Amino acid sequence: MFRMAHYQPGLVLGFEPYIQHYYTFRILNSFAGLDQLHNDLLGVEHLPLFPDCFDVVFLLGIIYHRPSPLDTLRDILAALRPGGTLLLESQIIPGDRPVALFPESTYAKVPGTWFIPTAPCLENWLKRTGYRDVRMFCRHPMSSAEQRRSEWMIFESYEDFIDKEDASLTIEGYPAPWRVFFRARKA
């Protein structure tokens, strides 16, 4: 949200359902003093309360945590103004077929992970839920270079979630995650 301030938007509204993250942002913004940045204790499930409201929605690291990802994409589409843009970041599994993994309980030790699609599957989800001009603009394997332990983050991290013998697999034996970015538009 702070990076968006550079573009001088009229309003940036962050949905943050976790109270510790909500207050962390509030404290940081009290120092930054950026009046156009706001957050509310809301989640993506509250988007139906905002019909035709947003010019841009950033959905970052959320879609695979939703038990009904297609409903979530439809709710976002309804919350976008005509011509509005969705910027979506997600974990995916590698592959050229339009399929999604439905893990038994956890994926890379993360509970609450429902569906991990391939890039073609995610593209189809976007198209079939009504988005236009769907474009994938980045895809790469995840690695410990982007998610790792540090003196500030001492808990388990990426290297603990991946099979020690075969880095192409998660600890559960599923394909290891990749990261993908899509841009899509409401007609």
Label every PLM stretch briefly.
Residues 113-136:
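Short alpha-helix
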Residues 91-113:
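Short, glycine-/aromatic-enriched active-site segment of Class I SAM-dependent methyltransferases
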Residues 1-9:
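Conserved SAM-binding loop of SAM-dependent methyltransferases across substrates and taxa
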Residues 55-69:
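A short SAM/SAH-binding and catalytic strip from SAM-dependent methyltransferases
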Residues 70-85, 92:
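A short glycine-rich, Lys/Arg-flanked "PGG" loop and its adjoining helix->strand segment in the class I
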Residues 138-187:
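A C-terminal cap/extension of S-adenosyl-L-methionine-dependent methyltransferases
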Residues 45-57:
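A short acidic, Gly/Pro-enriched loop at the edge of an enzyme's catalytic core
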Residues 32-46:
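Conserved SAM-binding strand-loop segment of SAM-dependent methyltransferases
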